Amino acid sequence: MIRRLHRVKVLRVERAEKAIKTQQACLQAAHRRHQEAVQTSQDYHLWRIDEEQRLFDQRKNTTLNCKDLEKWQRQIASLREKEANYELECAKLLERLANERERLTLCQKMLQQARHKENKFLELVRREDEDELNQQHYQEEQEQEEFLQHHRNA
């Protein structure tokens, strides 16, 4: 019975180890996605600054009417809104990354608990083996004693 329970504990340790490997892969993927998003955001930021400068230089020595000024302002606003969306995506991915780290920590705690329980049952199995061996020695001694008693009386 104890051996079967120990086997269950071993399986739980194996399952917890597998969960950690899976979670580590998820964490690495989340980290990679976040890094890519940060790089995209940084690249876009630099491009946006250059693009705003280019648009400004185009209009620098020209007379702007209200319609052209509004169009230019909309272009700039659109560029900045897109940059804000990139930054928002980075923030969301950073939050997901933190969640994946928390899940990994939880998996590690579960593995630690599973190993602790497995070790307890391993000790119980060891004690049971020891008790069985002692019982076997005792039984052998009893049989030997009976044999000697029987031959003395005969």
From Swiss-Prot:
Residues 132-154 are annotated as: Disordered. InterPro entries: Flag_assembly_chemotaxis_eff, T3SS_YscO. Keywords: Plasmid, Virulence. The keyword Magnesium does not apply. Component of the yop secretion machinery. Belongs to the SpaM family. This is Yop proteins translocation protein O. It comes from Yersinia pseudotuberculosis serotype I (strain IP32953).
